[in-house]
Amino acid sequence: GQQQLKLLKLLSARGQITATGREVAGFGMHPRLGLMLIQARHWRLEPLACDLAALLSERDIPGGRVVGSDIVHRLRRLRTSDRASDHVVLSRIRRQSLQWQKQLRAVKPAVKATPFNEPEELAIARLIASAFPEWLALARAGRSGSFLLRQGRGAMLPMSDPLSSAEALAVARLD
């Protein structure tokens, strides 16, 4: 609710909508995803952010659970799959991403943009962290698959998940 919007700086401490909050509201999407799109302009990562936002707007892509919890695999599938069974969902995600990219181009660009010249996995983590800052997670020592979120809650990944041995995670969805 309001506390979340204040944490994301979309509302002021007094509950007034901020300039960023007004920009985000113009996208007509979940505030976290809208914030990710706005933040993406600062790093020139708009197309990537739109793809991520479109992916996160869907429950999951066909076969998504098979690849574990890493959104990087879903993003690759979005970009490369040509299987007929995936066509409807992935086409909808691609269309949504393109629509948001068009909306972003129509918005005044960020004044101080610094291109993000790191591997795509780090760019994805940065974008997700900008939308879900309280869900940054550090691995718990000696407990593979066990993480402590920035907000203080614990989170677990199955040992079979490739991310279970990661030192840190930028989390976009908790089940």
Question: Each predicted region: which residue ranges?
Answer:
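Second RecA-like catalytic domain
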Residues: 1-175
